[in-house]
Amino acid sequence: MAWLEDVDFLEDVPLLEDIPLLEDVPLLEDVPLLEDTSRLEDINLMEDMALLEDVDLLEDTDFLEDLDFSEAMDLREDKDFLEDMDSLEDMALLEDVDLLEDTDFLEDPDFLEAIDLREDKDFLEDMDSLEDLEAIGRCGFSGRHGFFGRRRFSGRPKLSGRLGLLGRRGFSGRLGGYWKTWIFWKTWIFWKTWIFRKTYIGWKTWIFSGRCGLTGRPGFGGRRRFFWKTLTDWKTWISFWKTLIDWKTWISFWKTLIDWKI
């Protein structure tokens, strides 16, 4: 074949003449550099410097002290804030102002005496309004559920209510009062004082004077009816089902301070 005739041509390949060039590789010229001790010392010195940089950084006492100080400052900032007596006093002051202001204000005997005095004055004003209707006019009437029923309702609520020292109020037991207004006006301290102050006779009077369930006193204009429970049932309900602890739990948890404020 024709390609077999080229075998003799392969024997005369010029690449075979380049074999002596492999012996003169220029990379072998760097061998004296590696054998140079000074060069090796420089390389070792560079490696030592590169390795010792971190070591010197870690062994630097001043730098470590600075790191410790910075970490201590970062950690102590919160501690100093919590341990700061001024900040704690401010927080305590805010708590006292927000939560305890009403209780301290209501526990003040002078304030309680002033409230009792105003209640007496309001009652006297009611009596005066009944005795002197010409001077007071329609302001003396109690409104929609007044002394004479709905027939005497003037149609003008602002003129139908009773005006006391504190303006138009709708407390229970007043003329034109509403028991819900009186209940939500009470704070937790007042509730506790009011409930534990009640005796069994007081509870019986309050329960049997309700108009529809445990709704409080209806006032002079409403009908006074007895509840469907008998005295024995109410006595059992008060004595056993609602004990002292149950009342305290009911006031403390079911009606919290936030719920009462709302």
UniProtKB/Swiss-Prot annotation:
Intervals holding Sequence repeats: 3-8, 9-14, 15-20, 21-26, 27-32, 33-38, 39-44, 45-50, 51-56, 57-62, 63-68, 69-74, 75-80, 81-86, 87-92, 93-98, 99-104, 105-110, 111-116, 117-122, 123-128, 129-134, 135-140, 141-146, 147-152, 153-158, 159-164, 165-170, 171-176, 177-182, 183-188, 189-194, 195-200, 201-206
UniProt region (5 X 6 AA approximate repeats), positions on chain: 177-206
Taxon lineage: Eukaryota, Metazoa, Chordata, Craniata, Vertebrata
Positions of region (6 X 6 AA approximate repeats): 141-176
Keyword Transcription regulation listed: no
Region described as 23 X 6 AA approximate repeats: spans on this chain: 3-140
Domain of life where this protein originates: Eukaryota
Tissue: Brain; predominantly expressed in normal neuroectodermal tissues and in certain malignant tumors.
Comment field (misc): Autoantibodies against CDR1 are found in patients with paraneoplastic cerebellar degeneration.
Keywords assigned by UniProt, alphabetized: Repeat
Protein's recorded name: Cerebellar degeneration-related antigen 1
Keyword Repeat on entry: yes
One Pfam family it belongs to: LED_rpt
Gene that encodes it: CDR1
Organism of derivation: Homo sapiens
